[in-house]
Each structure stands twice: as C-alpha cells, then as structure tokens.
C-alpha cells in the first residue's frame, strides 16, 4: 500500500513541476539565477563597414553617385555578466547592473581591423555642421571657419578599429573644452557610442514573474515577467517627451520591454513583445512568425516588422519621433536624443524597407530580405534566446541642410551609411542543450518511470496478499510436514535410547573414543553392542 500511495502522489502532485518552478527562477541559489549572472551564450556581433571609394570624384562633380564597398565581417564576441543584484520584495522586482565586454574574434573575421583601412564620413564634423545650420547663419559661418582652421575633412581615412572604437578628433576635443556639459568625451568611435558607452553604469530594474491568484492563474494586471520596469530610474525616453504622469505612449516607453536576455516561460504563438537596447534609442516591436526547431530543440521564431523604424506624425505609436512635426523618411529611425543630439539614425541594412530614394545617391547597396531580416528565436522551456537569432540594423549619418560650408555641400540632405551589424547567437553550448532536453523529455520520463514502477510494485504486493487470503496452503503440504515431523521424532528416539545404553553400560570410554562417538566414529559401536 505504501508504494501505491507514493506512486499516486507523484502522479497527482507532480513534484517535478514544483522543482522546475523553483530552479527556473531568479531567486538566489536557483539554477536559472546562476545561468543569468553569467549567461553561457555565445553572442557575436558581426560588423560590416562601408568604405567610400570615390569621394574625391564625387565631391569634384566627376561622379554622380558615391560608390560603397562593404567590408567585413569584423566579429566581436559579446560577454555579458550581471552585477550588484538586489531583490525588491515589495514590488516584485530585481535591480542589477549589466556589463558587456567585446572581445575580437580573429578566426571569424575577414581581416585585422587595426591594419585594414577605410574611408568613411567624419561623424562629428557632419553632425555639428547639420546642427549649426539649423541654428543661425552666424553659427554656420563660425563652424565653417573653425573646421577650415582645424583642417577637418568631411571624409576620414583611418583603420577600421579606430573608426569603430575611437579616434581623437580636433573638433571633438575643442567642443569638449568649450561645452563640456554637452560633449564630455575627447575621442569618438561609432561602435563605442552604440554599444559600449554607459555599459557599466546603467542600473536596470526588472519585473520578476508575475504572481498567481488562488486558482493558480496569472494575475492579469501585473507586469509581465522579465520586462524592464525602469533604467537609471527612468521609465521612458525623456528625449522622446515621455510623460511620467500619463505613463507615456507606446512610442516613448521603456517599461514593458525586454532586454533580450530572459523571457516568460508561458509564451505562446499569440505573444508580441518589445526589445530594448540603448543602441536602438527606442523599443522595437517583435511579432510571432512560426514554430520551429534547432538541433531538436523547440523554438518560437519572432520577426521585426518592416515598419519598425518608421515615424508618422499621425500615428501615436511613432509620432514622438517627429521633432517639431518633422519626420525622417520612411524606414529611417532617429536616435539623436540618445547620442548627444548628433544626427544619427538606424535603418535596416542597405536601406531595406526604406524609402527607395535613399538608394539613389549610392552604388553598391543591395537590399535583400533573405540576408537582412531580423529574427529572434526563443526557447520556450527555458525562456532564453537561442541559435537562429539575428538582430540586424544599420547606423547612418543624417546630413541636413548645409549653409555656408562648401566642403559639406556635396553631402547635403543625404543619409550616409556608416556600418551595419548582425548581432547573433551561435550554437547553444552542450550544458544548455542537455538542460533543455532534460526539461522537456528526460526529467518527465524519469518521474513517470518512478511513479509507474512504484504503482506496479504496489499492485504486485496487493495481488500477492489477496491470493494468500483466498487460496491458503493445500493438504499435500500438510502431509509432507507430518512426514518430516515423524522422521525427526524417530531420530530423537534413537538418540535417547543410545544415551540410556551408555548410562547403564559399565564400559569406560577414553576421551578419544567419546569424540569418535560424537562425530560418527564406527569403532566404538561394537563395544556398545557388547555392553
């Protein structure tokens, strides 16, 4: 009965689910917590640079279009770790500081970024020129004179590494001295600003999985698990006019988005979520596309919508991106408020899904949905991103109207591609694959096997007991028992007769003969017979 009880208890109580719920949480000591502190994911950023090969011909009027050469990939491994973790029980959140390091992966790269050289836009000069032209004639004239004095050129020739991770610029250095509250750096690198800046100082506050009601159902009005609540105390983008009193709009909120490291375990095909990274300077909507699998692991594939970077003054989901009711062209998303108001923008690579007019000034751009679509793959049992994830976007320099600056006038009202990146996840490590297989198949199979084994053993014991009660031992066994008892009585009687004979006999036995008698010696028997 004990085995039947425990076997039934395993099937009814489902202790495996309770164990998984405890281990797949962010509570200290849990398995997921240990994985989350230092995620064992191989995340890589493939960087493709744009090399401007005919700048002199274009600026001199001898070429109608700029020729772009895509150079790459230069691959960097992103290593994430989470620090300064604090649990906030009253509001069911967790506070932490994510730190990302970028390690060059030469075996995956096309060349050495410190050796390879490109010619690309001078981002500080072009950015400040656009800002000055929008202010006044005197500002534009003054900046033009300073640029000539510093010999700043619209296009720079330098190593790929310096352009990505930082180079000293005289104009930036000058600005850092005169307007330190605005420009607080002396070198500039596009990858440095997009991915590394503020890397160790951003404090995230994230919602833990929502509590259940007394019936075990998810509380509907609670924040979704593993969504961002605030960053550095801000729940929205002030640069996009977030209003704390009204909780903002879908356009300028941060709260409710995911940082792309953890997702709820109860996701399904109807889910839609938002990705946040400072690089985007906005939330990016991601919608379910299909159920798929990688290396035998279940997966949900989500895709970014073609209009993810659009801005429309009449659409509340994107109207905040239109400053003074002026929007950028279709498919171009401004990120200026997050980068010192330098006119930068993000698009899909090669201006895919953007206004076709953006392609007209260039040769060498080829939009390709098969190559440039962004997909996000989530493993539903673990709630983690996995192989097949590709987040692809392009960084661009926005050049507006140029006044009183002859060097910059050839690039007026152009959006110049700088680079595009493919942030992707390589094959999951063996430990994660084993864990996911265990969650889906191994652990449930062990639980069912244990429960079934206990039930079968319990049924066998119960049946055996019932058979003994219904069919007691037969008479044949009683007869055999009587024969065995009779034989024993005869042996005992013979022994008693022998003892009596010894007592009456006058024969004296020496010790050796007594031992022979006890252990079956035959030489003493005749003496006993004569006695």
Annotate each language-model stretch with its function.
Residues 1-298, 305-503, 507-524, 528:
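Extracellular or lumenal secretory-pathway regions
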């Amino acid at each position: 009965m004990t085995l039947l009880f425990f076997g039934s208890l395993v099937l009814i109580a489902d202790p495996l689910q309770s164990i998984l719920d405890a281990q797949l949480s962010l509570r200290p000591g849990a398995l997921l917590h240990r994985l989350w502190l230092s995620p064992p994911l191989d995340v890589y950023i493939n960087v493709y640079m744009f090399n401007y090969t005919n700048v002199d011909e274009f600026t001199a009027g001898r070429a109608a279009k700029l020729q772009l050469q895509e150079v790459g990939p230069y691959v960097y491994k992103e290593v994430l770790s989470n620090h300064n973790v604090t649990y906030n029980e009253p509001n069911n959140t967790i506070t932490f500081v994510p730190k990302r390091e970028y390690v060059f992966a030469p075996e995956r790269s096309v060349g050495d970024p410190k050796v390879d050289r490109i010619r690309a836009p001078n981002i500080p000069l072009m950015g400040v020129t656009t800002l000055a032209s929008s202010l006044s004639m005197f500002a534009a004239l003054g900046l033009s004179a300073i640029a000539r004095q510093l010999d700043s050129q619209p296009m720079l020739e330098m190593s790929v590494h310096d352009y990505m991770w930082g180079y000293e610029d005289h104009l930036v250095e000058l600005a850092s001295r005169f307007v330190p509250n605005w420009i607080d750096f002396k070198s500039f690198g596009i990858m440095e600003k997009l991915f590394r800046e503020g890397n160790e100082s951003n404090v995230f506050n994230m919602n833990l999985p929502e509590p259940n009601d007394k019936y075990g159902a998810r509380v509907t009005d609670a924040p979704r698990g593993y969504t961002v609540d605030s960053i550095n105390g801000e729940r929205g983008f002030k640069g996009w006019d977030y209003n704390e009193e009204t909780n903002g709009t879908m356009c300028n909120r941060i709260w409710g988005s995911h940082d792309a490291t953890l997702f709820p375990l109860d996701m399904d095909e109807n889910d839609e979520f938002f990705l946040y990274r400072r690089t985007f300077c906005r939330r990016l909507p991601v919608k379910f596309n299909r159920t798929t699998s990688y290396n035998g692991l279940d997966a949900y594939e989500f895709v970014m919508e073609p209009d993810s970077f659009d801005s429309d003054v009449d659409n509340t989901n994107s109207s905040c991106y239109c400053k003074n009711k002026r929007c950028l062209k279709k498919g171009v998303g401004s990120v200026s408020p997050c980068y010192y108001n330098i006119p930068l923008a993000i698009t899909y690579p090669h201006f895919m899904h953007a206004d076709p007019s953006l392609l007209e000034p260039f040769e060498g751009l080829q939009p390709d949905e098969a190559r440039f679509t962004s997909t996000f793959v989530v493993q539903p049992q673990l709630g983690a991103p996995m192989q097949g994830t590709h987040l692809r976007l392009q960084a661009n320099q926005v050049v507006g109207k140029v006044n009183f600056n002859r060097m910059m006038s050839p690039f007026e009202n152009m959006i110049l591609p700088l680079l595009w990146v493919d942030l992707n996840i390589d094959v999951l490590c063996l430990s994660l694959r084993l864990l996911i297989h265990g969650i889906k198949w191994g652990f449930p199979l062990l639980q069912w096997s244990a429960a079934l084994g206990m039930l079968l053993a319990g049924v066998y014991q119960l049946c055996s007991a019932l058979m003994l009660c219904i069919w007691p031992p037969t008479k044949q066994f009683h007869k055999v028992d009587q024969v065995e008892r009779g034989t024993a009585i005869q042996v005992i009687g013979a022994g008693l007769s022998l003892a009596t004979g010894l007592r009456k006999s006058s024969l004296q036995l020496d010790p050796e003969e007594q031992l022979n008698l006890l252990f079956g010696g035959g030489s003493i028997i005749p003496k006993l017979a004569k006695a």
